[in-house]
Amino acid sequence: MKWWEKEPLRIIEIFDCFDLKRLSPEEIARAVKKLGGNSQHFHCMQHSTKIYGSGLDDRSLYFNTSAGSVQNPDRLTEYIPYAKKYKIKIIVYFNVHWFTIDFGKRHPDWVQIKQDGQPMDNVYGTGTSFCINSPYREWVFQILKDLCKYEINGIFYDGPIFFSNTCYCNTCQKLFRDKTGENLPQKSDRNHPLWKNFIEFQAESMEKFLEESNNIIKGINPELLFYMNGNSNWPYWPTGRDNHRIIKHTDILGAEGGFIYGDLNQTPIFKPAIAGKLLSSQANNKPTVIFDCADHKPWSWYVLPEAEISLLLCETCFSGSNYWFAVCPDDINQPEMKAISRFGNFIKKYPDAFYKTESLSNVALVWPTKSAESYTGSSVPRTDFTSIIEGEEIGNLHMEFDGFYEALSRIYIPFDVIDENNFDFLDRYKLIVLPNTACLSLNDCEKIKKFVFSGGNIVGSFETSLYDEAGKIREDFGLSDVMGIQFNGNIFGKMEYDYVSPVKNIKSRYLKDIKKILFPAPDYGISVKTTTGNTEIFFCKRMKGRYDGIPEVSNDPMMVVNKYGKGTSIYLAGSFGKTIANFRFIEYFTILKNICDWLSSQYVFVEDNKNVEIFLRKKGDSIFLYLINMTNGLKRPIKFLQTLYNVKLKLKETKPVRLFALKSETYLKHKKTRDGIEFVVPELNNFEIIKILTGGEK
């Protein structure tokens, strides 16, 4: 077992790469320890100087290497004794995506070229980037060889990356021409017949670069950790970073799920957990890490409130991932840092709750990776590597996914996030949620059909399965027989003041507690007719204005229930998740809760509508119930969490159990009920973890 697999990783980065003299080596080691870290990203390469400019430069390497054009003091050798003294694992941070303009001018054949023929010159507004297909790769490999001579524990690549308008360097053009016999297409022209070839070429280039990097490192020292900054729930076409390829040649799968930007009210509070859950499903049983940042991006020297930092940590670790936290030198002693140190030391005290646990969820929400690459409703979010690229408003993938994610969380459903690569293992779940999973291959559809026919259940919305994996529209849904519908040929909307209406006088388990005869429609709908399915909610006829008389029920189905073999399909003929994300209509939450109540089995029940998010995982005979307090102010950034008292929970557990609250360090009393047990958490501040002991473990 490798060192990074033996305990939860608590990775701290002291962000001193802009001034390596800011802190002494021992001050850095003490800071990492103070913040609860057991490992760190260590900087021995300076990223900005007044002389050389912004970005990495071959004159700014502070360790012994033949790749440097200047011999600087050996900071790495100086630091190693302090890392040993404070028992910290050293992971060298290696920036492989941002370089000084001057460095690029000295190596013009290394520079990434934009589709307009100009060199890349605005990385973070100030620097350039080099191409991994160019001779630059040999410079990187030499640095790896030199770093591996030191007593370090790992190497982290920040990058590598392509950009949404690169790369057209001579090397890339030659390699693509040799491979296809064609010239590189415009990357911005997603309808070009060679566009997908270009995207796959870049993803393959990334994979080959990582494979060779890993071979160099492991060939020198098999005990060295190697990983990079990967992808989360966004497309890989702009960057070439395909997680399924990345994890083949790295030891950990990581992504910037905890970098939060701009107006935080527009950012899902669940962002780190989305990344953590998704990466866990993509990592092939290897560890995952979510990169969390203490600053409020893009203000990199402005720290977030303590409550926001606490939520980043909880969302990251309760999803089953390790954390990495970046802290600026000036912020080490700020009061907000107590959240990091307390959490890190809590993990150190109770590692089992954070180490090699397994999800107990029987509900899975699909992140549609094929749609993210090929569907017109797919957008690119703002990250440290990408600018916002808007998809079409109709069928917006991110909002559809985020809406379902939020709803499942708000109704207390523990769930996983998976992608199409997990469809071989659907039998571990009872309910699969497909949020506008538009682009599916025939093979994907067959796996879903088999799952439902054998007794599994699905919820699908809008254009789910209407396109093949390449984004080409089908004549009918690939899952038409499962969903009991046929495509009528058109999409309607935008509906800004229109309605849907439940069918009257039917006793439907899925409409329980829906009292209104009208409630708002999704902003876009799709025209279908039922075959074997039964309509339980109809769209109303479109109105010319919001006061255009009393809404009349149409013949267009909005919710169709269909039995298929032993399983059930619920089809929602509109942008259901997007409407939740935008408006949070109570009826939408109620419908989804009813579906989960009947088509999945739940172990945990939260009483009294407390604003709590739950995660459920197991290890051996122990079950861990993670509670996050979501009771806060109406706007972000969140400055405080309102303490909850007497949070009442029920467990569908018939075995004798003991309940131990890790954070409050107390055993909880419980009483038996007809179908399980119930107990009370007396006080919930930011979080609590309940260890449910069902065996002889203490």
Where do the protein language model's features map onto the residues?
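Mature N-terminal, pre-catalytic/accessory segment of carbohydrate-active enzymes
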Residues: 1-58, 62-93, 215-219, 359, ...
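Carbohydrate-binding surfaces of carbohydrate-active enzymes
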Residues: 6-8, 195, 200-232, 236-237, ...
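A cross-domain feature marking catalytic cores of carbohydrate-active enzymes
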Residues: 13-16, 44-46, 90-96, 159, ...
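Short, acidic/polar
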Residues: 18-34, 134-147, 236-245, 305-313, ...
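Catalytic domains of carbohydrate-active enzymes, especially glycoside hydrolases
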Residues: 24-51, 150, 252-253, 313-319, ...
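Aromatic-lined carbohydrate-binding/catalytic grooves of carbohydrate-active enzymes
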Residues: 33-78, 98-124, 164-176, 237-246, ...
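Active-site-adjacent "subsite" loops/lids of carbohydrate-active enzymes
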Residues: 92, 96-150, 172, 176, ...
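An active-site-proximal structural segment forming one wall of the substrate-binding cleft
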Residues: 128-163, 216, 346-349, 353
